[in-house]
């Protein structure tokens, strides 16, 4: 089980962080059920005054999912707000988490700083780790593929699962986090060298960007500020071009585009020694990214011709997700002893007790 907030089109950071892996897992045949959530309710926690932003980006995220290879026949794609059971589960889980524990969550802390929420944090945003725990546990997820920055969220979910099972009995499944295999994909920086891609910072390469947009963004990408001349020795560490090449390049790319280099390691060594310009490295990256993005772009154009069909896919996916979440919610309420109308023994016992009083 995994998902994304619909606050904009998905970018390369999403792609290498978890999206590409989702497609691989989907096609591996290892999982009986796969749930991919468009987290609109979570997106509203810091966009409450701009619901149209979330509303309009539902379709963008869905198109990105489909164009990357997520298949509704194998992966159940749904919209979070259309599964109300998730909200009810989160409400019960709130009793199992302290305010101080939420404050210590490093992901929450960094997100609060990034959004300048220091003095006025919306309650919904502050508690979104609990909401994520609800999303994961509702589907009895065993595996959650995410980027490195979301690892604390899964740890929080595990704590909630253990606490619930300890208090009420073994009902919830403890999930495991699945990080990207390539260390370079743990977190892809923005094109400006900032730690994270962000639409507001304008440092993203979107999956739906045209070839020309990708070319312009790569040519303007942050490199080594001290590498002023081709002859200057360059620094590979912290250099966005090489970070992206780490994530996307394959050995065959060098034979195809830069046959004078046997591998990325050779290219790096030449750059470190001097005599290799940034433009040559950037042109390689442009070619590598185009190989990855061209088929995604083409598939997106096809799905864009059937928006009605995409929404129908989301509607059906949400129905399947709701049925699954409803079963988990019933188990949770049974364990918590708040299943009053289903507990015939309780009703009969209390009725008998009052009859005896007469």
Regions found by a protein language model. Give the residues of each.
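N-terminal Rossmann-like or analogous alpha/beta NTP/dinucleotide-binding catalytic cores
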Residues: 1-134, 252, 291-293, 297, ...
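A generic structural motif
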Residues: 6, 144-145, 203
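Short, polar/flexible loop-turn hinges at active-site or ligand-entry regions and domain interfaces
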Residues: 49-52, 144-147, 171
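Internal, conserved structured core segments that host functional sites
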Residues: 106-110, 114-164, 168, 189-190
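Conserved nucleotide- and phosphate/pyrophosphate-binding catalytic cores
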Residues: 152, 158-358
